[in-house]
């Protein structure tokens, strides 16, 4: 059951699509992963994960949750990042190019940041800010695991970044 205030806001926002929104809670969870282009030389076999392409993300794939790719040594080695497929859309829409400077203001745990870094291909600068110190530490770990070397991880209030 959704809190009434939230439900009322969503009804007003979605109008005739509100029923579809409610029905989405009864659908199976979509699970996805993104291959890491910074480790593109990887030739391992990911077929056991039953991958199907995410239409809006060339490095993104749906997987069968029962295959549990988070337990694979490939995941620990940073060859891919587990990410909900809809969360792959912002970086695809921004489409940063190698050599550009990019800011991810609310960066943890690192899904968007690692995807942005993959698009930069080690060129340019990615500034990743996370206001919560514990989450910033998780973000740093994910950046390191995926082999990202052109990123700066900050733990600041966004207002301080303008000073």
Per-region residue spans from a language model:
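S-adenosylmethionine
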Residues: 1-163
